[in-house]
Amino acid sequence: AASRMYVLTGDPMAELLEVKNLSVSFFTPAGEVQAVRDVSFSLRAGEVLAIVGESGCGKSVLCKSIPHLLPPSARRKSGTIAVNGRDITQLRERELQKLRGSLFSMVFQDPMTALNPSMTVGAQLAAAVRVHAPRLRGAALEQRVLELMRLVGIDRPEERRGLYPHHFSGGMRQRVVLAIALAGDPSILFADEPTTALDVTIQAQILDLLREIQQKLGTATVFVTHDLGAVARVADRVAVMYAGKIVELGTAEDIFYDPRHPYTWGLLQSLPALSRGKPRLHTIPGMPPTLIDPPKGDSFACRNEYALAIDYEEEPPMFRISDTHFAATWLLDPRAPHITPPIGSERHG
């Protein structure tokens, strides 16, 4: 009943999810780790938004903070998270629990640790279905389990529902995890590096499956990854994160063909497919800053070969490049010297 308050408007342009000025910190013996810093973005119904960046940039924390799946050491310091216009940050845990799985659902990195090794996959799927439809029993429940297994591409579900997770390959286990995530017909699916534990050929199959399900069910998806190749395969829009902040946001075409932030340039140049026959892969010098004590000004300045004096003094605002494209770099200020991007002026295929 609680989820009815979040019924989709039917308008494909309506903002299903809107995050504004979100900051999340972890409180540790070493100090306060500012994992997510003043992040804002939106997600439309049926859209795939990829959040990309290096390990430790805050992308997984951002993803888990929306359905309130962070550990006790984490705290939301500021910001709002609205679904269909209603702020969910003030909801109690009991109310949030009703929304998990039905409004939003999560697919985690490692399918083996996400599944119960002592239960058959059919029993685990049935348990997930009954959380959201407790009155569903017998043949109807069995039919729903088989339907979910078919949806994620598991052949011969009648035979395989009686198997245990260890009988399945990594790719098939991830399909089971995805089926469990879809059991409550969620409006938003969070996929936190869902292909990291899989080999390359299986990764491609799972990415294609995610895209196929999104198109079939109209599920909005937030896809967290450090793999730009995966982003190119599935994303409609891309948010590039660095040191707890979104530094560039745009359509996949904006980011791949017209990147504006020097960090995005570095990420794209490091892709083997874009090395243009050079004997050495491009690397970004230095290390990301500590988020216990973020530097003054632009956090990327010390690694940025195009850094201006102001980068070390003042944090750049988010500059608007077009209706769909935004980047936080002083190079976009009208007073900045003109820099020709080292990448992005041609189609990369």
Where are these regions (language model features)?
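The feature captures the beta-strand-to-loop junction immediately N-terminal to the Walker
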Residues: 52-53
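P-loop NTP-binding/switch modules centered on Walker-like glycine-rich loops
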Residues: 68, 190, 194, 198-279
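Conserved ABC transporter NBD signature motif
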Residues: 75-87
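Conserved ABC ATPase "signature" region
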Residues: 86-87, 139-159, 268-269
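Short catalytic/signature loops enriched in Gly
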Residues: 155-161, 249-349
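A short, proline-enriched helix->beta-strand linker immediately N-terminal to the Walker B motif
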Residues: 183-187
